[in-house]
Amino acid sequence: MTILQSYTTQMVLLGTALLGLASGIAGTFAVLRKESLIGDGLSHAALPGVVIAFLLTGIKDIEVLIIGAALSSITAAWLITITVENSKIKFDGALATILSAFFGLGMVLLTYLQSLNNAGQAGLSKFIFGQAATILARDVYITSVAALIIIVLTALFWKELKLISFDVEYAKTLQIPVTFTLILYRSLLIMTIIIGIQSVGAILISSLLIAPAVGARQWTNKLGTMCILAGCFGMVSAIGGTIWSTTVQKLPTGPAIIVILSVVVLLSLIFAPNRGILWQFRKRGAP
């Protein structure tokens, strides 16, 4: 337990805990809107933004890389939207195509950057699978502030986010600013993704965004309870995965967090009352 007494480890745990909490809350609305795959597309799209930001500036500070990731994810979201609206391609087709293109571009740029033997690029590959051990106290501060902003915005616009999650047309009849709320919803997803790629990685951050909500949905039909449960599942998994990756040498943080989160979701799918597999078997076997 000595490693847990380290100030650096405590800061990293704080950052990943808040990230897990924010991810569970933001992902709840994506699951309810049946847009679980949007997180996958936006997270993969963030990678080329990270690399391009470094290529243009030569700076590896998290503030710079986050801006690159955000611009790249926003561009991907915009391309997905205009593709669906102006062609016969459906949402999943546009998402898969743009996801693959952006992530492929990111990998090509990362390979090119590594071939330059630029010492400054060391550590950028950690953005693929994540590595909490490389996070500095300043990075944790930025992550924590962003996570708190996500939580506060969700609380402030709770009614609006709830309505667009279930019935957009009904929200319009109530004079809810639907366009603004949809932009806010996508912004929450993008913000969660860009603050999480350093810890969890571009490949797996979408799982941290969606899986907690999937697990929480098994236990309740109430949105508020679902949000709280999803946040708790994300937070506990993030803490557990961070401790695991910190204590085991060369274990990336992202996979460690997702393995623990997968266990939580699996247990929810099996044991949750009313929706769980065991409960369903019990009901079928009842006379």
Question: Residues of each region from the PLM?
Answer:
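Transmembrane alpha-helical segments in multi-pass inner-membrane proteins
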Residues: 195, 199, 203-253
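Hydrophobic alpha-helical transmembrane segments
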Residues: 13-18, 63-71, 96-97, 140-145, ...
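Alpha-helical transmembrane segments of multipass membrane proteins
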Residues: 25-29, 51-55, 78, 82, ...
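Cytosolic-side transmembrane-helix boundaries in multi-pass membrane proteins
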Residues: 251-287
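Transmembrane helix-bundle core of multi-pass membrane transporters
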Residues: 98-154
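Helix-loop-helix "hairpin" substructures at the membrane interface of multi-pass membrane proteins
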Residues: 136-212
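Short loop segments and helix-boundary regions at transmembrane helix junctions
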Residues: 28-43, 47-117, 217-228, 248-250
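Membrane-interfacial amphipathic/re-entrant helices at transmembrane-helix boundaries
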Residues: 1-21
